[in-house]
Curated annotation (Swiss-Prot):
The reaction(s) this protein catalyses: L-alpha-aminoacyl-L-arginine(out) = L-alpha-aminoacyl-L-arginine(in); L-arginyl-L-alpha-amino acid(out) = L-arginyl-L-alpha-amino acid(in); L-arginyl-glycine(out) = L-arginyl-glycine(in); L-alpha-aminoacyl-L-lysine(out) = L-alpha-aminoacyl-L-lysine(in)
Quaternary assembly: Homodimer. Interacts with lysosomal protein GLMP (via lumenal domain); the interaction starts while both proteins are still in the endoplasmic reticulum and is required for stabilization of MFSD1 in lysosomes but has no direct effect on its targeting to lysosomes or transporter activity.
CDD domains named among the record's database cross-references: MFS_MFSD1
Family: Belongs to the major facilitator superfamily.
Membrane-spanning residues: 39-59, 83-103, 113-133, 135-155, 170-191, 213-233, 266-286, 304-324, 331-351, 361-381, 392-412, 418-438
Keywords, comma-separated and alphabetical: Lysosome, Membrane, Transmembrane, Transmembrane helix, Transport
Protein name as it appears in the record: Lysosomal dipeptide transporter MFSD1
Length: 465
C-alpha cells in the first residue's frame, strides 16, 4: 500500500496542469508515459485498444483468403465451406444480447476482455487443428468458439474506449479502431495465400497439414490481441487506483420486452441492415474464386481485389463519419450507399469491365453506410431501449449472415456465380426498397432521421433552454 501511495503522490506532483505551464516536474514524479492523466499515456492505451481487435478481424476472413486451399485440402464443396462463416454467426445470434451484460454484471471489463480474447485464441487453435488432423467438423467447432469471443471482444473494445476517452475524442477513437480492424482484414487477405505457398514449399506438398499449419501461424495475431487485453487490464486497474476512476461499463440494459415497442422506422432500419450486409460479407467470403474464374486474375491479384473493400474502409470510415456528423441527412446518405452497392453488384454480374471499379465503389458505399445507418438507431428509440435495439440489430444481422452464407454456398454449387450475383442484387434491391419506405414513413411521421446537422443542433438547443 505504501508503494501505491508513493506512486500516486509522484503522479499527482507532476500533474497535467504543471506540465502544460512548462513548470519543472516535482522530484520523484513519473514520466508522462506512466501518468494515466496525461495524453501520452492515453495514446499508449489507444494503441493497445486498436490492436486488441486486430487478431479477431485478421482471422475472421482466413477462410476467404484460403478459399481454394480449404475446399481442395479438406475436400468440401462451397456449401460446407460457407458453414465456416455460418457457425461464427450462429454463436452470436443469442450472444449479442448478453455480451454487454456479461461485461457489466459478471466478469467486469478487464476479465471480460481477457476471457473473450481467450475464446478467440482457443477457437483459432481448434480451427487450425481441424486442418492438421483432417477433421472438418473440428474446424467448424473452432469457428463456433471463435465467434463466441469475436463479437463480444468488439463490445469490450468499445467499452474501454468510452472509459478512457470522452466527447469529441470518442468519435475519432471509434474511427481509428474501425480502421485498424479493416487493416487486419486487409493484411489477412493479402498474406495468408502467400504464407500457405511458403509452408507448402517447406513441407514439399499441399494438403490439410499445410493448411492447418498456415492457420496456426495466422493465430499468432490472436495471441497478440490477448497480450493487449492483459496489458489493458493492468493499465486500467492502475489508472483506477491512481485516479480513482470507475471501471468501464457498457451501460447496456437489455430487456426483450422492449421489442414489442419498437417503431416501424426501427424495423425498417433492421431490414436495411440485414439485406445490405448479407450481400457484402458472404460475397467477400466467396470473392477470391469469383475474380479468378470470371476475370482470369492470379491468386495473389484476386486476393488483392477482394480485400479492396477493407482497404478503402480503413481510411474512409473516419472521413465519412465526420461528413455525416457535419451534414446530417442520414437517410439520403444511406440511400446513396445502398444504390451505389446495387450498381457495383450489377457491374460485377453483367459486365466484363475492370472489377477494380466496382470493388472500389463497393468499398466507398460500405464505409458510408456504416457511418450513416447505425447512428439512426439512437434517433428512433428512447435511450433506455438503446441496448436492446443495438443487441437485436446485431442479433438479426448475424442470423441473416448465418442463413444467407449457407444459401450462397448452395446457389454457387448448383447454379454458379452469375445466379449468386443475381441473388445478391435481389438482397440489395430489398434493402433499397426499405430505405425508400423509411424515407416516406419518416416524412409522414415528421421524424428526425433526415434532419440536417443544423436542424438537430437547433432542436437540441431549444430543449436545453
Amino acid at each position: 500500500m505504501e508503494e501505491e501511495d508513493e506512486e500516486a503522490r509522484a503522479l499527482l506532483a507532476g500533474g497535467p496542469d504543471e506540465a502544460d505551464r512548462g513548470a519543472p516536474a516535482a522530484p520523484g514524479a513519473l514520466p508522462a508515459l506512466c501518468d494515466p492523466s496525461r495524453l501520452v499515456h492515453r495514446l499508449l492505451v489507444l494503441l493497445l485498444m486498436c490492436f486488441l481487435g486486430f487478431g479477431s478481424y485478421f482471422c475472421y476472413d482466413n477462410p476467404a483468403a484460403l478459399q481454394t486451399q480449404v475446399k481442395r485440402d479438406m475436400q468440401v464443396n462451397t456449401t460446407k465451406f460457407m458453414l465456416l462463416y455460418a457457425w461464427y454467426s450462429w454463436s452470436n445470434v443469442v450472444l449479442c444480447f448478453f455480451g454487454g451484460f456479461l461485461i457489466d454484471r459478471v466478469f467486469g471489463i478487464r476479465w471480460g476482455t481477457i476471457i473473450f480474447s481467450c475464446f478467440v485464441c482457443i477457437g483459432q487453435v481448434v480451427f487450425a487443428l481441424g486442418g492438421i488432423f483432417n477433421a472438418f467438423w473440428l474446424m467448424e467447432f473452432g469457428r463456433f468458439v471463435f465467434g463466441i469471443g469475436g463479437e463480444s471482444l468488439a463490445v469490450a473494445q468499445n467499452t474501454y474506449a468510452v472509459s478512457w476517452f470522452k466527447g469529441k475524442e470518442l468519435n475519432l477513437v471509434f474511427g481509428l479502431q474501425l480502421s485498424m480492424a479493416r487493416i487486419g482484414s486487409t493484411v489477412n487477405m493479402n498474406l495468408m495465400g502467400w504464407l500457405y505457398s511458403k509452408i507448402e514449399a517447406l513441407l514439399g506438398s499441399a494438403g490439410h497439414t499445410t493448411l492447418g499449419i498456415t492457420l496456426m501461424i495466422g493465430g499468432v495475431t490472436c495471441i497478440l490481441s490477448l497480450i493487449c487485453a492483459l496489458a489493458l487490464a493492468y493499465l486500467d486497474q492502475r489508472a483506477e487506483r491512481i485516479l480513482h476512476k470507475e471501471q468501464g461499463k457498457t451501460g447496456e440494459v437489455i430487456k426483450l420486452t422492449d421489442v414489442k415497442d419498437f417503431s416501424l422506422p426501427l424495423w425498417l432500419i433492421f431490414i436495411i441492415c440485414v439485406c445490405y450486409y448479407v450481400a457484402v460479407f458472404p460475397f467477400i467470403g466467396l470473392g477470391k474464386v469469383f475474380f479468378t474464374e470470371k476475370f482470369g486474375f492470379s491468386s495473389q491479384a484476386a486476393s488483392a481485389i477482394n480485400s479492396v473493400v477493407y482497404v478503402i474502409s480503413a481510411p474512409m470510415s473516419p472521413v465519412f463519419g465526420l461528413l455525416v456528423d457535419k451534414t446530417g441527412k442520414n437517410i439520403i446518405w444511406v440511400l446513396c450507399a445502398v444504390a451505389a452497392t446495387l450498381v457495383s453488384h450489377m457491374m460485377l454480374a453483367f459486365t466484363m469491365w475492370n472489377p477494380w471499379i466496382a470493388m472500389c465503389l463497393l468499398g466507398l458505399s460500405y464505409s458510408l453506410l456504416a457511418c450513416a445507418l447505425w447512428p439512426m438507431v439512437a434517433f428512433v428509440v428512447p435511450e433506455h431501449q438503446l441496448g436492446t435495439a443495438h443487441g437485436f440489430m446485431q442479433s438479426i444481422q448475424n442470423l441473416g449472415l448465418a442463413i444467407i452464407s449457407i444459401i450462397a454456398g448452395m446457389i454457387l454449387d448448383s447454379r454458379g456465380y452469375l445466379f449468386l450475383e443475381v441473388f445478391f442484387i435481389a438482397c440489395v434491391s430489398l434493402s433499397l426498397l426499405s430505405v425508400v419506405l423509411l424515407y416516406l414513413v419518416n416524412r409522414a411521421q415528421g421524424g428526425n432521421l433526415n434532419y440536417s446537422a443544423r436542424q438537430r443542433e437547433e432542436i437540441k438547443f431549444s430543449h436545453t433552454e
